[in-house]
């Protein structure tokens, strides 16, 4: 799939950058904000400061299209905070099963942890493309061990029910293995789950915005799927890393089309 020629990266605070973006220009906000749950005494966790969600919603609602989807990674109390920040538009949560456990130091006090939440909002029905998976064929309604049908659910047409395939609709549990390699960013998400979300809530050529992009994983997912990407990062080290990462990914896809990677600095 040929990549679009619109990948825009901005260095600066998202509250300085977002007001400069045009209204009704984004179809999906895919947010992996700081959860604000790490040890405040740890100097390496200084970046984990809560974002002003009310101020963020004000800008996102202006920039998003009427049927824009707003998707947040979250966990623990931060999940509650995210939902409470916009109860009106909250629709549902997904559970990301990371297939990797943490919390061994507290294993005798509480269950090991292997999931994070994904919180979905929209004001008007957003685009939704179910990502089907293969499974065993569905049980045909009315069949029983004797081979004779039953009428527990009323009459039905066997010719119609026999048309069911082994394609399965997605559930609220998403199983994507957490990256096992040395993480580029301390809260980096697998490109695979980001691609799943981008495919689910956008069309080819739509625009996705990540207001705190970190190492640029969301941008890579968008490049892979022919989506336009707007990424914002205030940390200079991670911004530079994301630029280099996406430029490298762009070079890999040049044989399939031209990709333009633009970067801007806010001066903060």
Residue ranges and their predicted role:
Residues 1-6, 246-268:
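Positively charged, low-complexity nucleic-acid-binding target-recognition regions
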Residues 1-232, 237-239, 268:
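Core catalytic lobe of class I
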Residues 242-243:
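Conserved SAM-binding loop
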């Amino acid at each position: 799939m040929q990549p679009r020629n619109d990948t825009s990266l901005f260095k600066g605070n998202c509250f300085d950058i977002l007001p400069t973006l045009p209204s009704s220009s984004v179809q999906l906000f895919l947010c992996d904000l700081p959860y604000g749950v790490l040890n405040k005494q740890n100097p390496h966790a200084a970046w984990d400061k809560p974002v002003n969600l009310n101020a963020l919603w004000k800008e996102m609602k202006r920039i998003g299209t009427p049927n824009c989807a707003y998707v947040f990674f979250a966990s623990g109390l931060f999940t509650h905070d995210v939902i409470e920040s916009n109860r009106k538009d909250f629709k549902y949560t997904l559970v990301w099963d990371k297939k990797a456990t943490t919390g061994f130091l507290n294993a005798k006090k509480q269950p090991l942890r292997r999931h994070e939440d994904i919180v979905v909002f929209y004001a008007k029905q957003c685009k939704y493309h179910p990502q089907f998976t293969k499974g065993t064929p569905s049980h045909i309604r009315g069949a029983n061990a004797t081979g004779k049908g039953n009428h527990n659910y009323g009459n039905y047409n066997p010719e119609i029910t026999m048309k069911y395939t082994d394609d399965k609709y997605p559930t609220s549990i998403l199983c994507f293995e957490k990256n096992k390699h040395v993480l580029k960013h301390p809260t980096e998400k697998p490109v695979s789950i980001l691609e799943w979300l981008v495919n689910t809530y956008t069309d080819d050529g739509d625009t996705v915005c990540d207001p705190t992009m970190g190492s640029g994983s969301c941008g890579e997912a968008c490049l892979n799927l022919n989506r336009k990407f707007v990424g914002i990062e205030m940390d200079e080290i991670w911004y530079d890393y994301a630029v280099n990462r996406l430029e490298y990914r762009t070079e890999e896809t040049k044989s399939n089309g031209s990709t333009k990677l633009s970067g801007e600095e806010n001066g903060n």
